[in-house]
Amino acid sequence: MKVAIIAPTYLPSLRANTIQVMKMSQAFVAANNEVRLAVPEESTKEPATDRSWESLAEQYGLRERFPIEWIPASSAGKKYDYAWRAVTWAGKWQAEIIYTRLPQAAALATFRDHKTILEIHDYPQGRMGPILFRAFLKGRGAKVLVVISSALASDLQKDFGSPEIQLPLIIIPDGVDLDRYKDIPEPRTARLELINGTAWLNGENKASFQVERFTAGYTGHIYPGRGVSLIIEIARYLPGMNFLIVGGNPADVERYRSIVAKSQLDNVFLTGFIPNSELPRIQAACDVLLMPYQKRVSASSGGDISRYLSPMKLFEYLACGRAICSSDLPVFREVLSSETAILLPPDDAPAWVETLKDLSDHPSEWKKFADNAKKTAGNYSWENRVRKMLTALA
């Protein structure tokens, strides 16, 4: 089947949604579809210095190759001009399915009677969000609506329900590339590899990073609400543990490095951005992986996404086979349970400190959680997401 994927954001980018689009493109290819990906390109900006497949595959951890079309998009057009061009491009290619997270493209594609799958991760925003969403639902080509959490599905059904939502609505959380987590080393071995074979820890960081220490890790963006301040607070009370914080935009990383330096903490390490291809072996260096999301969580756009979260790190953590300490947010209980993670109050630092002490003192406890997490991860591959979408389409 010919599948045109219309991405909502620029490429390459540090945003999580570009990782998701690239992983989904790869998964559609793995399911024996002919895939082409459209991404916006601002005409007023110089192209990225390296958009070669080799560079993109390294940044996003890809194995399957697929063509990418950069389509002009003006900042004044607010993605409407891009949506028009991208849907036209898909039509000329005679795509059998259009899959997108861009509401403008979904509304136009269904109006033109293209079979369309729309995936959304948040409630339709602003004045135009609900209008575009309803336009998609009413279009002749609307075939499947994908949402990432039951909470989001419930709110959509309440506000846009029958008779508007008449197409299949399926709940599919985000996913993970399971193959990349096969045969990862045990934590101490991974830490040795981290010290000896990577540039992400260097200079003073490398000198103070102690391989034998119990290590807690966080990977992903460090926007407000992700809990990095809580991690730093916890680290003050656990000087005998390593705290590894991986990812983030340069400005955010420098801000937190400054806080760590002023606090004179030598057990907190911020690596900054690393390519997705490197992520499994760095996560493997941790004995426990942290998701200290707060009650209000910012996305790259600045909006609050705490009600509908389905972060990719959750599924990566499961696949890594490590203990997970997570904030006890209702949306996380759609995936996690007391068998797969330790769920903690997001604003109770002493509870996090005591839990990490307990895990460090009783390795058999974290091994139990890790084994259960690894088993659970098998349900959340990118390929499974694609299969569910195509099944709903049939």
Predicted regions span which residues?
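Conserved acidic donor-binding segment of nucleotide-sugar-dependent glycosyltransferases
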Residues: 311, 338, 342-349, 358-363
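Conserved donor-binding/catalytic core segment of Leloir-type glycosyltransferases
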Residues: 4-6, 146, 193, 197-205, ...
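Short hydrophobic beta-strand element within catalytic cores of glycosyltransferases
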Residues: 289-291, 316-319, 323-326
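Carbohydrate-associated surface elements
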Residues: 151, 175
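Nucleotide-activated donor-binding/catalytic signature segment of Leloir-type glycosyltransferases, i.e.
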Residues: 206, 213, 254-283, 288, ...
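Glycosyltransferase donor-sugar binding loop
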Residues: 41-43, 219, 242-257, 272
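N-terminal strand-loop element at the rim of the active site
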Residues: 7-15, 26-81, 152-153, 157, ...
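A short, well-ordered alpha-helix in the C-terminal region of glycosyltransferases
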Residues: 358, 365-379
